[in-house]
Regions:
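Nuclease catalytic cores that cleave nucleic-acid phosphodiester bonds
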Residues: 1-151
Length: 151
């Protein structure tokens, strides 16, 4: 088992690595060269660098993830793709993502993308997520602990 972190979209990488270390589980941080920081690396954290091209990190994560692994990502399409592989997917707010939860999220993501690409509407009126909080960080660590103990 390993914890794979989508390094381009996930905050609190250090806390995720520490949680893995506590249980003897290594973390693999997949990130573009643009987001790399040596501060994250130690004997329990390995960086896998990818080119700074669209979906490059997502493809690498899909190739690395095996049954029993935990992936931490905020990427909705990536979460959806990982559902078939018996991988536990957790977002940075501590929500464990399931396939049945994903369908509405994927539909919304697709519609928003179509609106943005059309260029007809500059602002969709859709707001981004609320500010990341200490409660969110606590939920993330709790979800990781639960996933580690449950596998």
């Amino acid at each position: 088992m390993k914890i794979i972190i989508d390094g381009d979209s996930t905050p609190n990488k250090t806390e995720i690595i520490e949680t893995g270390r506590k249980h003897g589980i290594k973390a693999v941080i997949v990130l573009s060269t643009e987001h790399f920081s040596e501060k994250l690396l130690d004997s329990y954290a390995e960086a896998v660098l990818v080119d700074n091209r669209p979906q490059e990190a997502d493809i690498k994560i899909m190739n690395l993830a095996k049954a029993g692994d935990i992936v931490v990502t905020n990427d909705i399409p990536l979460s959806f793709m990982l559902q078939g592989g018996k991988v536990t997917v957790i977002n940075s707010r501590g929500m464990t993502v399931s396939k049945k939860d994903m369908r509405p999220g994927m539909e919304i993501h697709h519609e928003e993308k179509k609106i943005r690409r059309s260029g007809k509407i500059k602002r969709t009126g859709i707001r981004g997520p609320k500010k990341y909080s200490e409660e969110d960080k606590g939920n993330l660590i709790a979800a990781l602990e639960t996933a580690i103990k449950g596998i």
